[in-house]
């Protein structure tokens, strides 16, 4: 298996420095042709949602259209994305420097994400929990 420094750095990032996770990921990648090895494949295997999907989710929430939100949530789930991953990655995005948002909105969104995570832990239905999350986000974000 041919691995370059870019792939090694990506593995280190997604495994968060956990050697066992890195080894498991390498074992999984070894079963895949090295010609296909790229960062997108690693993200897919690790269940990482592409950033453009998260940003689009937030943009759809800004439109404050309930029918569109239902379609967005259904498409998100049909694409196989994890609501837990959405909550984690959205929290990271909101707290990053790349997110141009007032601090007050960021705090409200983080609180909503925390509530959503609790609902998931308590066994909430992913579709309903995700739709609830989208509706609450749309209440916080200003309309386009």
Predicted ranges, named:
Residues 8-14, 20-32, 41, 54-59, ...:
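C-terminal helical "lid" of AAA+/P-loop NTPase domains
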Residues 56-144:
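Helix-rich C-terminal "collar"/helical-bundle subdomain used as an assembly and partner-interaction module
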Residues 14-15, 80:
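Residue-level hotspots within the lipid-embedded alpha helices of multi-pass solute transporters
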Residues 34-36, 100-101:
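Short, glycine- and charge-enriched coil/turn segments that flank and shape catalytic ligand pockets
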Residues 36, 40, 47-49:
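Conserved beta/loop motifs at nucleotide-recognition and modification sites
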Residues 1-6:
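Conserved small helical "lid"/interfacial subdomain of P-loop NTPases
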């Amino acid at each position: 298996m041919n691995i370059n420094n870019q792939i090694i750095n990506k593995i280190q990032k997604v495994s968060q420095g956990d050697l066992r996770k890195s080894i498991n990921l390498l074992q999984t990648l070894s079963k895949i042709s090295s010609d296909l090895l790229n960062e997108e494949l690693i993200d897919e295997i690790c269940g990482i949602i592409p950033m453009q999907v998260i940003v689009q989710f937030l943009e759809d929430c800004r439109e404050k259209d309930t029918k569109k939100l239902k379609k967005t949530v259904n498409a998100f789930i049909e694409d196989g994305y994890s609501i837990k991953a959405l909550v984690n990655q959205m929290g990271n995005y909101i707290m990053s420097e790349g997110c141009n948002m007032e601090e007050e909105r960021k705090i409200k969104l983080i609180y909503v994400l925390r509530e959503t995570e609790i609902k998931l832990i308590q066994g909430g239905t992913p579709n309903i929990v995700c739709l609830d999350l989208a509706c609450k986000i749309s209440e916080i974000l200003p309309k386009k």
